[in-house]
C-alpha cells in the first residue's frame, strides 16, 4: 500500500449553476459545491478528468476547463502528474469552469448524454453492424453470497464438525436437495430444448430512458439564426410520449416552440414564463419528464447492483458473436445512427502514422509505459474495427477500386488510409507450393509474426497494422500502407515522333525495396543499415541465422522485404516465412506424393511460434546453457530459407520438425491420459491446447490416430486381462478347494488325537486346543494389483472431438470453395442448402436450393448439383487430404442424431448465425410441435418446406487481427508468481498490480483479463483465501461469457473451477447451481454420449456434498443416477459401475436397508470377480459383504420367526408395537458410515440391532479363514 505522502487529495469545486442529479435525500450545499477525490501523486491530470467523466456529480458536464487555486486554467496539462501540479503537497484544489458550447462540443455532449440515457446497449460493439451480439446470463444465476470465514470461526468449526460434514443450515440443506433434483430433471430434457434455453440470452441490461433523441428535420440551422448562436436542433420524445423540440445554443439547451409542421426555434413559454436554458440535457429533461428521472435512477440503481463487467461496453475487444441468436433480433428506430455522419468533425485518420508515433513515445517512467500501452491497445482495436468495416463494404460491392478494370480478385482498394487486397497467388509466388491455398496460409503466418513483433516492440523496426477478414469464401487483407509507397509520383508524357501520339505513364515511386526480395527486379537486395538493425534484437528474438541467398547476406527470409518509407522509418513486410518449414510434414505429404489429388493442399506448412520457443527452451535446458548467454550469442538459430529455396538446407530445421512429430504430439496425448490437461469440451478447446503446445491443426488426423492406437492397446490389454482372470479364478478355486480339504484333514487328525487322549484319560496338550497353525506361505492373500482398465473417459472424448473438428473444418473448406464466386446475397442459400442436405433429408428427402433474388438465379451456380451422398464424399476426401484421416463406416450417423454439435462447429468456423428457433429434423418433430400449439394457432400454422431456410441465418465475417497484450502486466505477473511462496504479501500485491495495469490497457472486458482473474482465483485458493478466490473466479466467468460466449470452453472451464471453489467454501447450493448450468451446456452438445468425464466428476462431487450435508438418501439418489449414466454409455459390466454398486451397498446398509444393500453388493462382487479376479482385495471384500449381509438378514428373519412362533404358542394376541426403525418414526441415516470398512460397517450394524449372533461371528470367522 502507498505511503500517505504518495497520496494527494483533489478537491473539485463545482459550478454554482449545476443542477446535478440528486439520488434520494442527501445533504445539499457542500456535496453540490465540491467533491473530494484521492489519487496517487504520480497519476496524471487526465486520470482526474477520466473520473469526472463518470462521477454522478459531473458526468453530464462535457465541456469545461479546470482552474487551479490561483485562477490559472489548466490547459494542455492533461499529461502532467499531480505531483508537478500540486508542488508535492497533500491537497490540490481545482475549480470546474463551464465553457460555452460550439457545434462540435454540443454534439459531443448530446452523444455522451445519450449513452448515459440508456441508448448505449451493452450488446453493442464496433462490429454490431456486421454481426449480432447477445446479452449475459451469468449475472442471472441466483448464486448465494460468498461465505466469509474468520480464522477464529474456522478453527472452532474444525474442532466441532465431523470429518465429512459441512457447516450448513437446514435451509441450505433443503435448497441443495431441491437444486440437485432440478439437475436430474435437466439431464432428462431433450438436447435441442437445453440448447434453445442456454442460447436464449436475456434482453439488454441497459434500457433507454427516452423513446428517442434525434436531430430535428429543421437542421441545418438557417442562416438567419446562426448569428443568434443556434448550433442545431433536437427532437426528443419522452417516455410519456411528449415530443420536445430543443434548440442548442452556446449556453446550453432550451425547449423551443417548433412543432412537426411549424418551425419556430424561439424559447417556449411555460405558465407564462420563458423556458429556462439548461446547460445539460439531463437538467432540461429532468425538468420536463418525471418518468425520465425515475428511469435514470432505476438504471443507475441497476448498475450499482451489478458487476460492471455485466454492462460495460468493450473498449479493446469485441463481444462474442454466437452461432444461435434471438429469434427476432431487436433493432429499434434510432435516426441518430444515420444522422451523426453529417456532423463528422473528425479528420481522416492515418493509422500508420499514429501507430508508428506511439512506438516512438518516450517510456522512461512506469506511468508513461502504461499510457503508451493503453493507446497502443486502443489503436490496434480501432484499426481492426475500421478495417473490418471497410472490407465488408468492399465485399458487398460498395468500394471503389484503384484498378477497376482488373478482375475482382486482383483489385486493390485504398480507403481511409487503409490498403485492401484480396488474398491469392496473384503474382504466382506460390505457384509450386499450392497457389491460392499457400497464399491464404501465408497470410495467417504473417499475422503470427506481426503479433510477436507487437509484443517485442523492438526499436527501429517498424511493421504494418494488419487485419484479415474472411467472409463468404473470400479473404481480404487490410493493412496500413508504407508511407509513400502508394503516393502518386506524377506522370511522364512521351510523344511518338512518327505518329505524334502522346503516351501518359506514371513515374515509378522512389519508395522501393532496400533489403530482401525485390519482386520488380526479381532478385534479393542488400542494405547495410537494414542488416544492422535486423541482425541485433530481431534475429535473436526469432532465433534466425544469418545466411546467403543469391550471393546476398540476409537475416530474415528471402521472401520478406525491407522498405524505407517516406517518413524515413524502416519497415519490414511479408514476414510469413520467418518461422521454419515443417520439413518432415512437407516431404511426406507434399513433396513425396506423386498423385496431385492426394497431396496436401499446399507446401506452406510452417512451424508455429509456440513450438519454436518450446524447442529453444528445451535446448538450453538440456544443454544447461544460461538463458542470457543463449539469447545474446543467438545460439540454436535456424535458417528460415532452409528447404524453401532449392539447395538450402539446415539440420536445425529438421530437428525442430522432428521435435514436433516425435516428442510434442505424443506428449500431448500422454498429458491428456495423465490428467495434466482436462478433456476438451469442444473443438475450440482442443485447438487451444494444440496451439499452446505449438501443434498445427493439420495434425488432427495424426493425433486422432495416436489416440485410437492407445485405445486399441488398452482394449487388447483389457481383453488379455479378462482371459487371464478366468484362468486365475479357476486356479484359485482349485487351490481353495484343496486348501480347505487340507484344513479339514488337519482338523480330523487333531480331533482324532484329542479323542485318543481323552479315551486314555490323559490331559489334552494346549497346542491341540489352540487355533490351527497354518503356514502363511501357503495362503493366497488377496491381491492389490492395479486394475487393467480402458481409459474411455480420456480417450473417447479426444477421438470424437478430433473427428468433429476434422469434419467441421473440412466442411469449412468445402463451403469456401463453393461460396468464393458467389455474391453475398446468394451465400445464405448455399448454407441453408448444405445444412438441409446434411441434416434435413429425413424431414425432406430432396431439398431444393432456395431462390433469393430474381437477378441471381440459383441454377447458374455450381453448388446446386450437390447431393447428400456427394457432400459426404467431399467431406471424406477433404479429411484425407487436409488431415490425413480416414472417416470410417457410417461416420455421419451420430451427427444426424445430435446435429447441433456439428452445426455449431461449422457456424463458428465459417461465420454463420442461426435464429434460435425450433428446427424440425423429422416429420415426427414437426407433428410434436404442432400438437403443442393451441387449436387456433395450429390451424394457421404453415409447415416449413425444409429444415433450414435462407430466412433462418445470416453470414458474418471471421476476423484475425493483432492481439495486443500488456508487457508491463506480464512482467509484474511473472515477478509476483515467482515470489508468492516466499513473500505472500508482496507477491499478491504484484499480481494485483498486474491485473490492474492489464485492465487499464485492455479494459476489464477482455479475455486476457478473464484468464488472469481465473489464475488468480487458483492462487488465492491455494493460500486458503477462499472468499477472495470465489470473487475473482465469478468475475472471470462474467467476462468470459460476454467475450467468448455462453457455451464457450473458456466459460465451462471457469465454471468448473468456480464449482470447486464453492465446494471448498462449503456452499453446496451454489455448487449444484453451477453444475446445473454446466450440465445444460455439455449435455445439450451431446458430451454425455462421448464418454466425457465431466459427468462422472459432477456426480462424484454431488455425492460428497450430499454426505457433507448429512443427506445420505440424496447421496443414494445421486449414485443411482450415476449408475444409470454409466449403464447408458458402458453397459452393466464395467468396473466403474461395480464401484458405484459397492458404494450404494455401503450407503444402503448404513440405512438398515439390508436386502437392497445385498442386491447391490452381489452385482459388484460378480463384476469384480470377472474384472479383477476371485482373489482380488475388492472381490474378497465384496464377498465378505455378501456373506455378512446374508447371515445378518437370515439371523433377523430367524429371530422374527421365533418371536411370531412364541406369540402364537402362548395364545396371546399380538399388539402393535413401535419399531425402532418403524414408519412412525423418521429414519436417520449415518452418512459417516458410507466410507467405513466392511468390518466396521458390519460391527456397527450388528451392534445397533443388538444381534451379535454366533452365526454371524462364525460366518465372519469362516470368511477370514477362507482368505
From Swiss-Prot:
Known partners and oligomeric status: May associate with the eukaryotic translation initiation factor 3 (eIF-3) complex.
Ranges of compositional bias, category Basic and acidic residues: 1224-1239
Molecular function GO terms recorded: mRNA binding
One cellular component (GO) term of this entry: cytoplasm
Principal subcellular localisation of the protein: cytoplasm
TPR repeat copies, ranges: 64-102, 420-453, 716-749, 795-830, 904-939, 1010-1043, 1138-1171
Database matches in HAMAP family: CLU
GO terms for biological process, alphabetical: intracellular distribution of mitochondria; mitochondrion organization
Residue ranges occupied by any Clu domain in the UniProt entry: 329-586
UniProt region (Disordered), positions on chain: 1203-1267
Biased composition (Polar residues): 1203-1219
Biased composition (Basic residues): 1254-1267
Compartments in which it is found: Cytoplasm
Family membership noted in the UniProt record: Belongs to the CLU family.
Protein name: Clustered mitochondria protein homolog
Keywords: Cytoplasm, Repeat, TPR repeat
Function: mRNA-binding protein involved in proper cytoplasmic distribution of mitochondria.
Gene assigned in the entry: CLU1
UniProt xrefs under InterPro entries: CLU-central, CLU_dom, CLU_N, CLU_prot, GSKIP_dom_sf, TPR-like_helical_dom_sf
